[in-house]
UniProtKB/Swiss-Prot annotation:
SUPFAM superfamilies: ATPase domain of HSP90 chaperone/DNA topoisomerase II/histidine kinase, DNA mismatch repair protein MutL, Ribosomal protein S5 domain 2-like. Belongs to the DNA mismatch repair MutL/HexB family. It comes from Xylella fastidiosa (strain 9a5c). It comes from the Bacteria. This protein is involved in the repair of mismatches in DNA. It is required for dam-dependent methyl-directed DNA mismatch repair. May act as a 'molecular matchmaker', a protein that promotes the formation of a stable complex between two or more DNA-binding proteins in an ATP-dependent manner without itself being part of a final effector complex. The keyword Nucleus does not apply. One of its GO terms (molecular function) is mismatched DNA binding. Keywords: DNA damage, DNA repair. PROSITE patterns: DNA_MISMATCH_REPAIR_1. It holds the Pfam family MutL_C. This is DNA mismatch repair protein MutL. GO terms for biological process: mismatch repair.
Amino acid sequence: MPIRQLPEILINQIAAGEVVQRPASVVKELVENAIDAGATRVDIELEAAGGRLIRIRDNGHGMAAQELPLAVLRHATSKIASLDDLEAVATLGFRGEALPSIVSVSRFTLMSRRAMDEHGAVLQIEGGTLGEVIPHAHAPGTTVEVRDLFYNVPARRKFLRAERTELGHIEEWARSLALAHPDLELRLSHNGKLSRRYKPGDWYSDARLIEILGEDFAHQALRVDHSGAGLRLHGCIVQPHYSRSNTDQQYLYVNGRAVRDRSVAHAVKQAYSDVLYQGRHPAYVLFLELDPARVDVNVHPAKQEVRFRDARLIHDFVYRTVQGTLAQTRAGTPPLAVGAGDVGGEGARPPVRHAVSFSGRRGGASHVLGSYSASTAPLMQSAPSVSVADAPAAYAALYAAPPTQVIDAVPQMQTGLPLAAGAGDVPPLGYAIAQLHGIYILAECADGLIVVDMHAAHERIGYERLKRAHDGIGLRTQPLLVPMTLMVAEREADVAECEAETLASLGFEVTRSGPGSLQVRSIPALLAQAEPEILLRDVLSDLSEHGHTRRVAEARDTLLATMACHGAVRAQRRLSISEMNALLRDMEATERSGQCNHGRPTWARFSLAEIDRWFLRGR
């Protein structure tokens, strides 16, 4: 078959395969055009989940009558005029491909009017044939009607899913849009019935979060807002125990554009690494703002992928911001009070809410902490830097279990919550009143009951102390008597050569000895017995894919977590009331104390109102 120029209609239909995948794609492109036109209200009307009709009405600037035919021409746009405009584009659309692609696979009607015009105009197109532009009564703004989507491409129409499924995709996209544009009023109707309505409002208000993402998300949200290096990251992440089995509540926006980015997703997941249960995923709504010239949005016709000029900086910025917010969480602290400031910046950390002054009447701080410190002294000590092989012996003394202490079966109630104490005087986790089956601590707080898994809580406290101790020591290296030869792919050898300084900071002294071979002369001392070959390969893989790695830190943390687990107080160990109270105070002062090292929750709160409902009180 000879080479020939394809007809315009076929070109547009081929392009539609990338831009118009389903009705939700059409809704996305048309509503983004409305937002770029300055609309503050958008109405979406659907029939048969968009398969029969998609009608988008907006109150934007509108178009002049003579511009309607231009709007549906390929690569015709009002948003860019030069390469400089493209490199700094801030609008949601700019390619001039969406409308021609939609026109080529539907029966299309375009109506518009500017506020300055006496009347509007309408243009109808079917099968790629443009009708005439004729005057038409219309309010200021634009209306687009897309009927019989894929009517002329039967193969594409057969791939559409059930009506409920297609509507679900549109509703999910509307949710994402409402999160990104809280000043936009959005109405979604299906088959003549109002399905969703998002009113303009403050994005950070509880009502807005509850309306879009539900009460559970809103009540577990930790606010994020950090700026630095010309970047700003703000939004919400949720506490680790509100994890998900999938990634359905992960929303990322770059300069207001909903995108998917593996590097940012990887950074967030790493920040949650030691507080998230295995196989679970964090939920978040994050907005990344930066100079448009530092991000390339012209990667894919659907504009759902971006490419950062400095991906390593972005990864590190997101990781540190999210990790810093999680580190501020303390057991008993209300979620929305956390991270409301400039997380990670100077003076950003809010005052710790659990800083409470104890008096002798409330249990005697010196006596309580002294008793608890004596019984758990091993975890108060700095951990030595040892190899994995030497760890059990070195830490045997450090974690030697103190002799079992037995207390009265019924604890004395006056050691619990003082009756005269006001709500403002009670620490977040309250005061211990009893121990349940040698496993759980029961504590009375200002508004109900706190239940603490004492082993899980003590495990996290010990883990954080060990991490701080080793952070103070720094990462020590262990030279090898005989250099180790490691055979790798040539690409990995290139990475090792380019990232020699990074590897040295991680404890690896590596030189290239051939196209696909490396000489390893030193390794991290703490991880000498932890399969350094596999660890180094993983580090090189991360550096190649993400430009960043935490493999060494994660391997170290895994070892420290194991040590902390072995050193934590065991089930059936009887604690005195004073020891339990001291453990509660330590939880309030320890980062990430809401989860153990494996991501399990360490405590739960039952409000008095909730307990009253169990017994039908007040009815």
